[in-house]
Amino acid sequence: MIDKNFKNGCVLVVGGSGGIGSICAKEFAEAGANVAITYCKNKKKATDVASDINPKVKIFQLDNQDPESVERVMNDAAKEFGSINTIVNAAGFDIPQKFINEIDIDLWKSVMDADINGFFNLVKSGLPHLRKSKGSIVFISSAGLFKYPPGDVLSVAPKATIEHVLKGIAKEEGHNGIRANSIALGIIDTGIFHRLREEENTFFDDAWHEAVLNTLALKRFGFPEEVAHTAVFLASSKAGYITGHSLPVDGGYHI
């Protein structure tokens, strides 16, 4: 059944050509939404993802570090579909697993800039569109916010800032009908996790694999479809009274 929140406009999935983003895009399309996805460099992958989902899916190249690029994509997506009803931020990149004392200032600055400023650019350009549609933001975050995993500060620290920005949006923009929520991910069996596991001399060796499984109540890693189902729910009318919330999808890691 098509959710009323998806009847008009589109769902813009930032990072929609990636492992989790592409599955989110597919789930939104199956829920009846018009879908637009963004990519940074790999146009072929984005084109393949779009064609696999639905010929009507539109792709846009986006550099979220460039405010003009973000503004252009927001306006083009809104023009193509009439409006934007949901922004899903599923963009991600391989972040080094380092302990705090191993991180130099240049690496720290580059990660903070990419994650925090990139998200803020999306918010700054997206809010005018979401005010018109009374739409929502869904941010793909980390369960490390609830239970810190040593060596993961470069992932968790910027997301902690973004979580407070989301709460600010929920508080300040609620009267405009805008909702803002996040999904706090545990280990999801796709994308970046696969690449990191395949690297030699990686932090993510077999011992790490077993140790993490032992911390999970459900004793398995998550599937991208489970993340996508949650994203669709949070953006739908069924979650119409939920805002400013971070929903763990982590197999019980945070317990």
Task: Name each model-derived stretch.
Residues 92-94, 136-162, 166-175, 187-188, ...:
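Catalytic loop of short-chain dehydrogenase/reductase
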Residues 17-18:
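Conserved glycine-rich cofactor-binding loop
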Residues 90-96, 252:
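Conserved NAD(P)H cofactor-binding loop of Rossmann-fold oxidoreductase domains
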Residues 31-47:
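Conserved glycine-rich Rossmann-like NAD(P)H-binding loop of the short-chain dehydrogenase/reductase
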Residues 174, 179, 242-244:
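Short, small/polar-rich loop/turn modules that mediate ligand/substrate recognition or access, typified
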Residues 81-82, 129, 220-249, 254:
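C-terminal substrate-recognition "lid" of short-chain dehydrogenase/reductases
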Residues 98-100, 104-110, 212:
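Substrate-binding pocket helix/loop in short-chain dehydrogenase/reductase
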